[in-house]
Amino acid sequence: MNTLQRLCVVCSKCNECAMELECLKYCDPAIVLVDSAPFKRNALTVVHLYRRLCPALAEQNARYQASLITLYLEMLLRCLYEDVLLVDEALGEFERHGDRQRYYRRVLRLDRCACHDTLEVTFTERIRLTVDVATLNEVERLLCKINCVYGVLEPTRGLELCRRLLSLMGRLCGISPVAAPEAYVENLTCLQCYEELAAVPNQGRSILKRLRGLLCDHLTVRKSLVQLETGIQTMEQDIVETVGSRPRLSSLLELLKGLSSSAAVSHAYISEAEDTLRRYNLFTDIPPRIYSLSDFTYWSKTSEVIVQRVNVTVQQLNMYHSLCRTLRNELGQYLYGDRVEDLFTLSEAQLGEDERLYVGSIYAAPERIVDLMTSLSLQSFENNPVFNKLHENNEIYSKIRSLLEEIRRPLDGAGTRGAAAATAAGARGAAEGTGGAAAAGGAAAAAGEAAGGPFQCGDPAARAHDVVREVHVRKKAYLQKVSELGYNRVMQCIKGQEKLIKKLVNVNLLGTVCFEVLAKVINGFIRRRAYLERVDGVVDVDRLLQYDDHLYVVNNLVHRRLPAESLPALGQEFYRFVNGPVFQHHADRYPLPYNIDMAYACDNAGMLPHLKEDLVRLAEGTVAPSEWMVAPYRRFFDLGAALDLNELQKGFWAHVREIVFSVALYNEAFGKELRLCRADEPVDEERERLVVTYNVDGPLFLYAGGGVWKSKDLYLLLYQHLNGAAAPPPPAAPSPPPAEPATTAGASRKRPAVESPGVLLDLVRDADRESSLVPDCLLYDP
């Protein structure tokens, strides 16, 4: 078993202990004090694990590499440690004062709220933003925003912000694997909801419209619990094994089993039809009546039934709850000599019958309560005559019953023909619905014509046209249309509300989305910080080279042009370096282009459309270097002059574009193969590469010729690479240059290095004055 497997085992055991401790908070403290030895043993184990593992996990997550399990286990151990101490202190206080209300308020932390936090995000000395975070949805959304501004956030500040988010998640989630209802908002979507919708056709709808009203099942994962019958069987087995067979308990269990097994009234002829159809298969002769019976049975099962039949009513739910409470009190009296008074019994007397439906019961499965609420909501539509489709099932059942009677009755030839005619008439009746009313209306209209009416005189065509009958037909068709549209809308509304109720009522376990995203962001900042802390073997090129070396590379690039056909590929490289570490679909088995990752990042962060347009315009690029060379000398990613976050982002994008396009032009002009890499991605150690760290104090690292160079200026590193970078000697302390004696031989004296160009002559290197590459106009010295 390796270290990761051991860590998973420890996490599993800690989860088991956390679930038991969370349930213990809701139990009667008097009963807990009767046998508190197991709690004491578990508490000592938790304290030992916390002191042994938590500091090492915190150091690993902050300095080396974070993962989903290490982040979750660190949070869980810290919360477990705090909760076992809290419960132990609360039990000691309860033993002195005996107040259950006070005990529950203490262990459940009802007197204070620690689920709200205000985080300060510092980008530069001028730009500081505050963000209020109170739910898991807001944590996930803030991580998406951090991913979008990943390059302009210093790694030390980013890691500090991530640590505060992990602490807040510990306060939101606690030790329970079941997420608290106040810790999340069920109708706010996450990044996985976005990715799932992006993988299917949009049918002409925007992503925001498709996300609106969608229930998220990723931040918290809904789990359906067992039904009542399974719970009773398990309960009976546990009671027999614990206390044996007792008459009072056995009678209560029998009442519970009889209550839960009472089913709703169903159509007996459906079962009879299934028994009849069971005698036929692929190799038997199938009479027409059997085929019709199978057809109607199929439609009776697959057609939508508005009024659902459930196996429990409100009265049964209340009776079931009362019997379970009596059974619990009997067990408490037998085992501990006193009735059980846990948190759920304190305000139970104030609930009425219908209120029990909305509050629920700890003894009933949430799925059963959801079915009951849906059934009660739908029954209000049963008596509405507009919804004609409500009665179609009864017509289908009547056809099934008539077919069964015909099968049981011996039929002669005429009877067979009559049955076939009845079957055909039944099929027509099912299709026509309530056509009899229209026929009656037509007969009444004909009688009115015979008796004399307003259309008996005049145009013969008008007399031949039965207006009254047409009115009835059109009215029937209109009502049928309204019925179908209304029925579909009602069913759509009810299904949507049922999904929402199931999400609210059922158990929702804590998902892994926030931990996965947090681990990716932390690892990115850790790798960027590693370049800040790296000192050994790194030579600062800014101390070796001068401004004219910078100008030499710039002048050789500024008059060249990039091939126009290379712009799309360079745009993809631009998106690669602008994006954060969260969306990495370019590394999937079936990789997506970098612009898809960037689109996911922008949409999930909520970037405004005009900023997206600016980003795309920069990505499209131009072939002229004069339009993208914008970074000052030795100030790459030094954006302290920006006044707001939008200006800061645009400046960052411009610097990234300059790096991508200038390195591509450098490779094109000098025939090099220098590769650009991110600081937070795996690299090929054998290849020459230029690593972009985004850090102000060392944004660029050059790996070439066995040596490592860093600089705040791109073109100094390109000059170092152009000169044939070799392993540098150990850097020596710079010595002051010797004083030159005054002489009149000005031609033999070297020009001092200049920090900014004054005249065109200053752009020329002294070693190249006699070179044919330099125009004569630059060599003229008046």
Curated annotation (Swiss-Prot):
InterPro entries: UL28/UL56 (IPR000501). Residues 727-740 have a biased composition (Pro residues). One of its GO terms (molecular function) is zinc ion binding. ATP binds at Y666, N667, E668, A669, F670, G671, K672, E673. It holds the Pfam family PRTP. Its main location: host cell. GO terms for cellular component: host cell nucleus. It is found in: Host nucleus. A zinc finger (C3H1-type) spans 190-218. The keyword Nucleus does not apply. One of its GO terms (biological process) is viral DNA genome packaging. Keywords: ATP-binding, Host nucleus, Late protein, Metal-binding, Nucleotide-binding, Viral genome packaging, Viral release from host cell, Zinc, Zinc-finger. Residues 727-754 are annotated as: Disordered. Associates with TRM2 and TRM3 to form the tripartite terminase complex. Interacts with portal protein. Belongs to the herpesviridae TRM1 protein family. Component of the molecular motor that translocates viral genomic DNA in empty capsid during DNA packaging. Forms a tripartite terminase complex together with TRM2 and TRM3 in the host cytoplasm. Once the complex reaches the host nucleus, it interacts with the capsid portal vertex. This portal forms a ring in which genomic DNA is translocated into the capsid. TRM1 carries an endonuclease activity that plays an important role for the cleavage of concatemeric viral DNA into unit length genomes. This is Tripartite terminase subunit 1. The lineage of its organism: Viruses, Duplodnaviria, Heunggongvirae, Peploviricota, Herviviricetes.
